[in-house]
Each structure stands twice: as C-alpha cells, then as structure tokens.
Regions:
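Active-site region of glycoside hydrolase catalytic domains
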Residues: 2-42, 85-87, 95-473
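Active-site-adjacent substrate/metal-binding segments within catalytic domains
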Residues: 23-98
Length: 473
C-alpha cells in the first residue's frame, strides 16, 4: 500500500449543481423564461423537466451530502426565478425557495457556494433587439440583480458571479450550438466575454462596498493548451492563440484589470478574421481595475486539455453531443486544429483525459497572476455511461479520474498554490445542456423516471476521502 496524501485542514470536499440542470419546474412557481426553454423544445431531443427535480427533492440531496461527508455544495440561483422579466417585478415564491434551500444546507453543515448566473440569463434580455450580454444594458441589469441577492440572501457567505464565461462564448459564438448562437464569430465571442467580465467587476465592487461579508469570485472553465509538437514554432503559436481565447482573455481581465498587449493583439486579430471589431472602452478598463483588490477567489472548472497543431483552412467544428467517440472536430481559422497526442486517453465524448494539465494550469495561475488569493476547483468529473445492475453502479473509471486529479491538486498545493476546495461535477446525475440524460456525471445515480437516488461506487470512495482527508495514490 502506498503512503496516503493529506489534504490541508479546512479543505472543502463539495459537490456541484446548477439550477437549470437540476431544479426542474422550469416554467412553474413564477419562473420566467430563459433562451434554453424554446431552444430545447424546438430541438425535441430532450427536456430539462424534471431534470433531477431538485426544486422538490433538495432535502434528499442535502441529506445525501451529509451522510457521505460532503461539506460544500455549489448551487446557482436562477435569475428568472427571482426576476421573471430580468428586472422589475420580484417573484416572492422564488425568493422563498432559495431561502429554504440555503437554510437546509447551512443546518446540515453543507455550506452553499452560490453562483448568480449559470448559463441561464433571462430570455427578456434577448427580446426587442437585445443580444444578452452583448447589449450593454444587460451589464447594469446584472449588477442590480446581484445587489438584490447580496442584500436578500445574507445567509450566503460564498458567492460567484458567473459560471464559465469562455464556455458561454464558445457555445454562443464559436461552436454555435447554444440558443441565439452563431458559428465562428470570434469577434462576438471576445466581446461577450469582455462585457461579462465588466459585469463581474462591477458586481464585485458593489459586494465589497455594501459590506455584505463573506467572499466573492468568478468561476471559469480553464483549459490548458499544448502544442502537439513543442519543438514546432507554428504549433506553439496555435496553442498560444487558443490559450488567449479560453484562458488569457478572462484571466487578464480578472487579475491584471486590463488585457496585456499580446493578449489584445491576438484577440483583435481573431476578431478581424471573423469580420468584426472589439469595443473595449476606457470606462470598462476602469471597472476591471477597480475590482482588482476585491476578487477574493477564483473557481476553476477543469475537465480536459487541448493539443493544437498549426493548420491552414476554413473553420470546421463539430461538437460531439452523443458520445459517439471520434466524431468531434475542431478547426478554427487563425488558430489551428485540435488533435489528440498519441497515448493520451479520451472519453466517449472526445474529451482528453490529462490530469497533469491541471497541475500545469494551477502553477501557471500562481506564476502569471501572483495577486490571486485562493482557488477552488469548482467542477471536475467524468461523464460516463453508467451501468445499473441491481441498484449497484460500478463507476471505476470515474474514481480513477477523480483520484488522479486530486493527486495533482495536492502536488500543486505542495508547490505553493493556494487551493481551498474541490467540488466534484456532479453531485447527482443531472440534465446536460447538449447531451440530455445519457451523459452521467453524478456521485449519485438518478432513475429519472422515479427520481430515486442510488449511491455509486464513486460516492463511497469520495466519502472516505472527504471524511479522512486522505488520498491513496
């Protein structure tokens, strides 16, 4: 038996959820519309109702957390459940629901880490010519919504503004498989990320000026980018350009308060290739700069990495949303082509499994952005086609995936990175935005017909790690 590795005292072992992916009740109890409602209905592939029925079943899930040693839970507030029209009239039933949820969490010792916008900006901001966060008035609306939540839900001490701004930009304007989406519009992708980062910055300043107490940060899907051939200058440049899209643009905004010259140069070049311009104003930079001292924490969602090689040609991206292994393609003009390095495994959805990439990413944040304060791994997990036999789910590949990533987190901590917690994605099986219900991530299996929960083998494994603070490598 190898020697166990010890997590620091106070390390959070959490599970992650998101409102639209777990709550169900998407058009009831006073909730307003979000773009996904009509988009998914038109596709007809799968419905977000009832998802995990968390709106009604959350006491069951919080009890499972308590029984399995999980002491933190990522949840999000559905903006349109509070403000059905984005602004104006408040839905008191939605406010009461979240108070009850947070009270249940806190009473059970399962501390809530709450995100304000997790891919479900209200539909109202896309009407009458609106384009969501591409329309600057949405920035101000978000800040007002955030201020309401800070003042109303004072029982919450851990806040995140947004979940995965790069993923939002990718789904909306690169892959184009999200509502109101367009393909290969890098100009709009960068602009969307910029506007959302300005909204984040203004909300962070409002939080600290309001003296609400606790901490606030942002969650980003950060993804290491590697040249397929590290000795090939063109491959290195392809990796650098991909890194600007996914990582540097949002990290610079968060921890520099502006965009480094080479970051801006790369973004401008890609925007021009897409036929557009960027609108980065002096007052935007002032807002980013004002938030610099107040970014208390960074949430890192991490699943995979990307290997890039230089290539010329036209855009060609195919998203694997079915689990048909080998069906994904990623070729972006001005960047290059994504590929798989020989010997590196992938999931059925073509996500590259490379846990060492998380270590590289964490050390990179520490070295390139030394003013960061703390990091939470806010999502990490493996989508898997779980088998179900007599109530037992043997998900050994998921355990191995988690074990490897946790080991690299410990190595990063040993290297001086301040990582305060880990939230497995996901707490329970959930609705997936582009995969529906066949791509399962949960520690707890859900029979979606009966809504009964079953602990998987990974839940028992994670319970042991959480309760002992020890990882057997």
């Amino acid at each position: 038996m190898t020697n166990p590795m010890q997590f620091p005292d106070g390390f959070v072992f959490g599970g992650a959820t998101a409102a639209y992916q777990v709550e169900g009740e998407t058009r009831t109890h006073g909730k307003g519309k979000v773009p996904w409602d009509d988009f998914l209905a038109a596709q007809g592939r799968f419905s977000p109702d009832p998802a995990s029925d968390f709106y009604n079943k959350y006491p069951v899930d919080i009890d499972l957390c308590q029984r399995f040693g999980i002491n933190g839970i990522r949840v999000s507030i559905a903006w349109s459940r509070i403000f059905p029209n984005g602004t104006g009239e408040i839905n008191s039933e939605g406010v009461a629901f979240y108070h009850e949820l947070f009270a249940t969490c806190n009473k059970a010792g399962v501390i809530p880490y709450v995100t304000l916008d997790h891919f479900d900006t209200p539909e109202a901001f896309y009407q009458d010519g609106g384009e969501g966060f591409l329309t600057r008035t949405t920035i101000d609306a978000f800040v007002e919504y955030a201020k309401f939540c800070f003042a109303e839900f004072t029982e919450v001490k851990h806040w995140f503004t947004f979940n995965e701004i790069p993923a939002t930009a990718e789904g909306s304007f690169i892959v184009g498989n999200w509502p109101h989406g367009e393909k290969y519009r890098l100009d709009k992708a960068f602009q969307l990320m910029h506007n959302m980062m300005v909204a984040h910055a203004k909300a962070v300043v409002a939080f600290h000026e309001g003296g609400f107490g606790g901490e606030i940060g942002i969650v980003q899907n950060l993804e290491p980018k590697y040249p397929l051939d590290p000795n090939n200058a063109a491959d290195c440049e392809a990796a650098r350009m991909a890194d600007v899209i996914n990582n540097r643009w949002v990290l610079d905004a968060t921890f520099r308060g502006h965009y480094a010259a080479d970051t801006m140069e790369a973004a401008t070049k890609l925007a021009h290739i897409a036929g557009g311009e960027l609108d980065v104003r002096d007052e935007d930079i002032a807002a980013l700069t004002a938030a610099l001292p107040y970014n208390d924490c960074l949430g890192v969602n991490t699943y995979k990495c990307q290997f890039l090689r230089a290539a010329e040609g036209e855009n060609d991206i195919n998203h694997n949303g079915t689990g048909d292994k080998g069906s994904s393609r990623w070729f972006l003009k001005g960047v290059g082509e994504a590929c798989v390095r020989e010997g590196v495994p992938t999931t059925d959805w073509d996500w590259i499994i490379y846990p060492e990439g998380l270590y590289d990413l964490l050390l990179r944040i520490k070295n390139d952005y030394p003013n960061y304060k703390k990091i939470y791994i806010t999502e990490n997990g493996m989508g898997y086609k779980d088998g179900f036999e007599d109530g037992f789910i043997d998900d050994a590949p998921r355990i191995d995936y988690m074990r490897q990533h946790l080991a690299w987190i410990l190595k990063a901590i040993d290297g001086g990175v301040n990582v305060d917690g880990y939230f497995v994605w996901s707490l329970q099986d959930q609705f997936s935005w582009t995969n529906g219900y066949n791509k399962r991530y949960g520690l707890f299996y859900i029979d979606f017909e009966t809504q009964k929960r079953y602990p998987k083998a990974s839940a028992y494994w994670y319970k042991n790690v959480a309760e002992t603070g020890l990882l057997m490598a």
